């Protein structure tokens, strides 16, 4: 099955149905219609989606994650939005743009976890490069617990050019770096914000760091001196959310 053509797992499939994703059909493990699979069946019937009962071997053959939980949805390819749609979406909500820019994130589980946290934290959209970055696959979808359906994701040819573009639109760009200028809790995230998160191994490139308005770091006192991309981005995103909540209350 090609990239982006299946969604695996009960919660992920339920979210796909609820959000109106174009689903061709849903495959369910024959004779295992219990628990939340009944919810999948009920929602699918309401949306008039074809349900097919198949044996476990068929599901195992199609599964890309090995964690299908007895249900796989056959879907159309994921549709990325245009980069400008993210800022427009924030304006429509009368909110200051909150964007996450990912640079060469290669691990699909990390990408999925970042998407999940971003959606929870109110991020308006995620930017990824067209090359050298994992795309939205079934593994990413499942790792995001279906959050992929609730957040905008766009691809750009050049991350640094995109950073220049949004800076011209009044968005402050903060790069995550171990040797940052200040701690993330010292930074002022109350305006329009873009967080730039680098790859698990290399971090941000020198040019990307130079493009950022401020480099921020996370306090670490243990012997291990790095966090994976999903944890680092989660800490940063929650700091932005915290400041926005406090700012709204003032």
Q: PLM features: residue spans?
A:
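RNA substrate-binding interface of SAM-dependent RNA methyltransferases
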Residues: 15-21, 88-182
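Active-site/ligand-binding-proximal alpha/beta "capping" segment
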Residues: 174-228
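Glycine- and other small-residue-rich loops at beta-strand/loop junctions that grip anionic moieties
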Residues: 5, 29, 103-104, 129, ...
